[in-house]
Amino acid sequence: MEGTRKEHWWRDAVIYQIYPRSFQDSNGDGIGDLRGIIQRLDYLKELGIDAIWLSPVCKSPQDDNGYDISDYQDIDPMFGSLDDMEELIKEAKKRNIRIIMDLVLNHSSDEHRWFQEAKKSKDNPYHDYYVWRDGKEGVYPNDMRSVFGGPAWEWVPELEQYYFHQFSVKQPDLNWENPKVRREIYDMILWWMEKGAGGFRLDVIDQIAKEPDQKITNNGPRLHEFIQELSRETFQKGDLITVGETWGADIERAKLYSNPDGSEFSMVFQFEHICLDQQKGKSKWDVAPLPVVKLKQVLAKWQRELHGCGWNSLFWNNHDLPRIVSRWGNDQKYRVESAKMLATLLHGMQGTPYIYQGEELGMTNVRFADISQYQDIETLNMYKERLDEGYSKEEIMHSIYAKGRDNARTPMQWSGEVNAGFTKGTPWLEVNPNYTKINAESELSDPDSVFYYYQKLIRLRKEYSVFVNGEFTLLMEEDPQVFAYIRKEGDTEVLVCANFSETPAACDLLSEWKDGEVLIWNYKEKGETGVLRPYEAMMIRR
């Protein structure tokens, strides 16, 4: 089975995630758009990435940042037109970059034509495209709650029925039990494949097989049957990359999702490592120090268990997560060193690495002085709730600085010009004030920058197959500072070794490997033998 997998282009690929709203504005309205991305393709080619994962750009009322789609076969005017999208796919292809689309197949917007028809009458051909239950007003079918708070059922008086929504009331769940719904979805995906889409990231895909009467939302009984049919009818007709977003995935489920026989997805996003710095049993806002030993154990487990029978997605950042250099590095004194250290650890592992826009510049979290400067709905809701619960403003702002989603969404920092070169207008979200120091223009003029370090990591993955195929062995498992592992393929071994802290760390491995070839290193001059300096990281081959 391992053999069949090797031909897939995505095995040694590196993917760059763009949050279009914050990447590059081309028309001065303060919102990033598709033409802006086209203008920056040469920058991405220089970095060396193979594909762009585009956060949602389909037509949407934007109730949930585009994850509420009202037309799967059109582009939201905020980002441009269908012609712009076709041009982006074409221009990216000229540079050997594929475009991965973000699709939401669990639910649509309530403004989608299907739902507008569905609520006209119980006899409407589109009625069964959604999940309905008869009932009485005020007496819910059951006590299920939506992810965004409140009941998961919404009353439609004309029909005397409730519809089911796992997310907002404006995101009714699609009824995957209905073969007509599935056919519509497959036809839409084939249409995008025809237009040249290189792959798909599938939002909350583990929730499509819900059974609300049994209170089952994710991992429903027919989930793998549905995914395998989806794959057969669409993805397997082209050499695409497909990524399932599966918050509920454990190792065994991930093996099914990313089976090398290609029956489901290329890989999944799992989030076990991302939840390690919150207090047990509490919300993401209740921050706890990162247990480095636990982080090593979790990442090593996924490396070992999926080797040869599945495939990992490797990521520190996305549009919902705080900037990794602020989160688990040091974004002040050791910003450059810790940004490079975190990159070294991730890019040495087996799987497909994802770089989130600005990560390659070492962009940091933002600390706006006032809540009015924030735009993220989750952040604003939490602020209100916690004030009512008696938290102090300082405590709440501390949580927002650490975990708020706007940390990832401040505009891309292109230059030291006004608004960081992102827009000639007023940006939809303020630019991080540190753009005068941290920006692409200054990174590109400095050979020791974070940007060129990422470029080199990407090249190493292409040059040495050990990073793609090699076995993984964790070393110094209980050490609270040193994160070290070996990748081995045939006679080739690579040591990846890093100090995950701002104090020097003893590391005897260095003397054992002193005759090896240093592939990459985030310090310029040699230090004391057997000691790793703050956030020092390297890869050594022998």
What are these regions (language model features)?
Residues 1-542:
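Active-site and adjacent substrate-binding regions of carbohydrate-active enzymes
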